[in-house]
Amino acid sequence: MDSAARPVSFPKSRWYAKSSKPKAPYKLPESVKPPQSEQPSSTPKPEYSAEQTEFDTKADPAGNAAPEASEATESKPQQPLPDLTQGIPSTLAAELEGRTKKSGQTSLNLTEDPSRFEDYTDDGRGDIPKDGYVSSLDRRRARMANLMYAFFLLAGAGGVAYLGRNWETEEEAKAHPDIPSGWSFSSWYNRMKARLSDITSYYKDPAFPKLLPDEDPNLRQPYTLVLSLEDLLVHSEWSREHGWRIAKRPGVDYFLRYLNQYYELVLFTSVPSMMADQVLRKLDPYRIIRWPLFREATRYKDGEYIKDLSYLNRDLSKVILIDTKEEHARLQPENAIILDKWLGDPKDKNLVALIPFLEYIAGMGVEDVRPVLKSFEGTSIPVEFAKRERIMREKFEKELEEERKRRPKRGVGSLASALGLKSTRTLDGEQSPSEGLAQGKMLWDQIRERGQKNYEMIEKEIRENGEKWLAEMAAEEEKARQEQMKMMKGSFTSMFGAGKQ
């Protein structure tokens, strides 16, 4: 029991901190030291600065050893370790620093010498080639793109070569009679060009091969007058105060209603139908203009909209085009009368001044209008026609006076027969041509009088029945619209099976 209560004794010991004195540098024994060569007594002065202690060395391994810190306070403090719980730290700075040390520092190109441009621009790649930065996915995409380019190039070349094949049908050969079949390069090229033109003709040529329908010549006027719209019959302008405004040219109603008895009136404009149709409804509410043609009926060539009269389905020897742009009549300039643009002058009379000339052509039954228009080329048609008319009138009066002197006792019929006219009777009680000649009236004077009477009749009908005509046309349009809506509803319901069985 005493032994159990006796306290346990332990040997006493002390722990002391070790000294942190720096160790002396290790020195090689004299036996292993390399022999030292004799140094020259006089050495040239170095070109480097004496302050750089790295160059102040001797050929002694012991002396070239890096000196150790003499005291612990002179050693650099240890940098804290990175916290890996926040992720692996970036090594970009170390890589860039190593690359810079490897490639070496380059001084600035202060002279901006183009020959040294490559020394300063490496795009951050160093010695690594450019394709080393391209991923494998990008390489596959580039290869696929090159293959697609090559495929499309070969397909296009093959398609173009296929277009130059011989004509396969008689219709194709008849459509291109000046391009025969054959395997010469010129024939192949012409066939290819013709087929390409046929493909693009859908967008460049008029919508229909015949813009006007076939009609019995006995039921219509023998001559066709084609009129432009913009700056000929109307003029449109825009201002900040009023926006778009459209003005009607002075004398347009008289011009259209008077010449309607001689010509088949056609409106041919390069303005789209969705815009020009609304203007035409206000300009000509009574439908004096028989056929309206819009941009869809023009021909597009070299950046211009051309009015090709050969698509009108009318005899070009009896077609006259009145326009304000020469480009519109480029294909048939011999059929065109080009006027100056009307810019809104309310006192303009140039359009009405053309009526006597146009009336003369239709009233006298000119076989071909093109030589007549050619004779007025480079002149003002109203002024030149007035001069020629005055000369013809003087000549007519002179011949008439001479004929009266030679045959004073002859009647009116003999005088008319001498001038090449036969005595005829009119059913409406009008004066016969022979009677008019006896009174000193030229033939086109009588035609003009008859035209004035017909115009007065047209004006009377419009005044008396114009409102009725407009109401009837509005009712017809509304009926057509209702029928169209009914058809659209029927087709829509039939798509879902709800139509009438």
Swiss-Prot record:
Q: How does it sit in the membrane?
A: Single-pass membrane protein
Q: Is Transport tagged as a keyword?
A: yes
Spans traversing the lipid bilayer: 147-164
Pfam families reported for this sequence: NIF
Chief localisation class: mitochondrion
Q: Where would I find the FCP1 homology domain in this sequence? A: 218-361
Its GO CC terms? TIM23 mitochondrial import inner membrane translocase complex
Stretches assigned to coiled coil: none
* Mitochondrial intermembrane face of the membrane: 165-501
Q: Where is the composition biased (Basic and acidic residues)?
A: 113-125
Which UniProt keywords are present, listed alphabetically? Membrane, Mitochondrion, Mitochondrion inner membrane, Protein transport, Transit peptide, Translocation, Transmembrane, Transmembrane helix, Transport
A biological process (GO) annotation for this entry? protein import into mitochondrial matrix
Reply yes or no: does the keyword Transmembrane apply: yes
Q: Where is the composition biased (Polar residues)?
A: 34-44, 103-112, 423-434
Region (Disordered): which ranges?
1-125, 423-442
User: Where is this protein's transit peptide?
Assistant: 1-16
CDD domains per record: HAD_FCP1-like
Please list the residue ranges that the record places on the Mitochondrial matrix side of the membrane: 17-146
> Where is the protein situated, by its record's location annotation?
Mitochondrion inner membrane
* SMART domains named in the record: CPDc (SM00577)
Question: InterPro entries from the entry?
Answer: FCP1_dom, HAD-like_sf, HAD_sf, TIM50
**Recorded family membership:** Belongs to the TIM50 family.
PANTHER family the record matches: DULLARD PROTEIN PHOSPHATASE
Its protein name is Mitochondrial import inner membrane translocase subunit tim50
